[in-house]
Amino acid sequence: MFSKDQTLAKTDTELWSAIQQENTRQQDHIELIASENYTSPAVMEAQGSQLTNKYAEGYPGKRYYGGCEYVDIVEQLAIDRVKKLFGAEAANVQPNSGSQANQGVFFAVLKPGDTIMGMSLAEGGHLTHGMALNMSGKWFNVVSYGLNDKEEIDYEQMERLAREHKPKMIIAGASAYALRIDFERFAKIAKEIGAYFMVDMAHYAGLIAAGEYPNPVPYADFVTSTTHKSLRGPRGGFILMKAEHEKIINSAIFPGIQGGPLMHVIAGKAVAFKEALAPEFKVYQQQVLKNADALAKALIARGLRIVSNRTESHVMLVDLRAKKITGKDAEALLGSAHITTNKNGIPNDPEKPFVSSGIRLGSPAMTTRGFKEAEATKVGNLIADVLDNPNDAATIERVKAEVKKLTDAFPVYG
């Protein structure tokens, strides 16, 4: 029998220490990685519940194990809430990640050797949309569209390639694209050539849920997403689909590519979907956009170039070449000042991916802390201070002290 006194602090001091240090890092550093956010205590409570003990292969009302009457309630709540949140006909909340959600759709309707078309990774796409080293690039014939001279999606190129290659599936969505995507235009060309249309909205899901970014659900056959990032839930994935595709998607996830679902994570998803349905979530997402705009403008004012010259979402790519610094070095320097970012390639980047000429920044996490435009502008100036003085230890220490003032004033968990 387990005793409730057998806490982690008592039973595994090494692991406990590492977790405490990470908690301190999250509190004391400004998080600007666009794919990261902070979940609510309620989400973490659900994930740390006894639901982690339950195996539940199958779907609500049709399980391969007994004792699933209560986890059925949990999963059905998640399904119903996410359908309401995005206006979807059907949903699967079992994917363990966004990548597995994408893989599930591929497994459902494609065969090895089929042609797919997605956004080039080098110009802002995601590795699961056809990167050569990814399963999607190994299993399928890949055609990639990219950006035009204005660093906007080249819709004319996309349409031309679609008509020429007639892919079985067209994919929209990105991991490093700051502008709005015209999902309706993608849907029209997909219909014209008889292709499936899938949208990976992982980065934009929170904004879409709040009505602050175009909703792909009315246009796409399949919409995949993560549940973290801008949606502010646990780490996981889900798939939205037309009702006609529900059976094949469910079969593709289980037993196709996964076994028993992670019921404690699905519970966390259900909590996050309920939170996203609240009016406060719309206010939060509106502030996410305001903060991203303020951050971008502050950086531009300090001589940095934003790819596409603006952001229309939570994310932006910063071209560092004018500062004569690589993304790898900028990430390390900013990290030493307690500002967390990630190096990222920019369009036509001359550097290798692990070096890169840019950094990717996002506003969701700092907005969760309570930052508004004034703080976002200050963060932009602190970033520029570091990049303007990369070899000055005094500047790093000064910026670190300014960061501490901000993080103390805006704790992650009050």
UniProtKB/Swiss-Prot annotation:
SUPFAM superfamilies: PLP-dependent transferases (SSF53383). (6S)-5,6,7,8-tetrahydrofolate binds at residues 121, 125-127. Disulfide bonds: none annotated. It is an enzyme of class 2 (transferase). It is found in: Cytoplasm. The keyword Transferase applies. One of its GO terms (biological process) is tetrahydrofolate interconversion. It holds the Pfam family SHMT. Its main location: cytoplasm. Keywords: Amino-acid biosynthesis, Cytoplasm, One-carbon metabolism, Pyridoxal phosphate, Transferase. Its EC number is 2.1.2.1. The modification N6-(pyridoxal phosphate)lysine is found at residue 229. PROSITE patterns: SHMT. It comes from the Bacteria. It catalyses: (6R)-5,10-methylene-5,6,7,8-tetrahydrofolate + glycine + H2O = (6S)-5,6,7,8-tetrahydrofolate + L-serine. The record marks 228 as: Plays an important role in substrate specificity. GO terms for cellular component: cytosol. Homodimer. Catalyzes the reversible interconversion of serine and glycine with tetrahydrofolate (THF) serving as the one-carbon carrier. This reaction serves as the major source of one-carbon groups required for the biosynthesis of purines, thymidylate, methionine, and other important biomolecules. Also exhibits THF-independent aldolase activity toward beta-hydroxyamino acids, producing glycine and aldehydes, via a retro-aldol mechanism. Belongs to the SHMT family. This is Serine hydroxymethyltransferase. The lineage of its organism: Bacteria, Pseudomonadati, Pseudomonadota, Betaproteobacteria, Burkholderiales.
